[in-house]
Amino acid sequence: MNLSCIIVDDEPLAIRLLENFIERTPFLKASFTDSVAAMQSITNDSADVLFLDIQMPDMNGMELSHMVPSHTRIIFTTAFKEYAFDSYEVNALDFLLKPIRYNKFLAAAEKAKKWFEMALQPQNNQHTTVFLKVD
């Protein structure tokens, strides 16, 4: 299973680092760094994982997170740990504190992969029982 990714960040160095991490992770593919392309991809519901910075000039990541389709999992990437609590209020899958190390990135990516694998499994483990009383 390959997961498509979008990077939304205003820092070129952070973008390059995340692109490098995505390239090193076999089950992740495709990244958009242009904010217009990213927004189009987000609204077209074509991204599985969104690596989203929080503090950005025009629209912050928290505001943008409310525009993300429910199918897309958000992993926040920020240098400000005080946003950690807020990130889980918008149902983020994970929160990576900058500077991001590859092992932390990989753990978050594995969490996303596991989430999608579980979401795609058929729900056959539910048993339905019907009792009828007939006179």
Q: What kind of feature is each model-predicted range?
A:
Residues 1-4:
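Non-catalytic signal-transmission and effector/linker regions of two-component phosphorelay proteins
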Residues 9, 33-36:
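Short beta-to-alpha connector loops in regulatory alpha/beta signaling domains
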Residues 8, 28, 95:
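Short, flexible active-site loop motifs that bind/organize anionic cofactors or intermediates
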Residues 6, 30, 75:
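Conserved beta-strand positions in the Rossmann-like core of class I SAM-dependent methyltransferases
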Residues 13, 36-121:
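CheY-like receiver
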Residues 114-135:
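Conserved binding/recognition cores within well-folded domains
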Residues 32-33, 55, 129-133:
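Short gly/ser/thr-rich secondary-structure transition/capping motifs
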Residues 11-30:
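Two-component/phosphorelay signaling modules centered on CheY-like receiver
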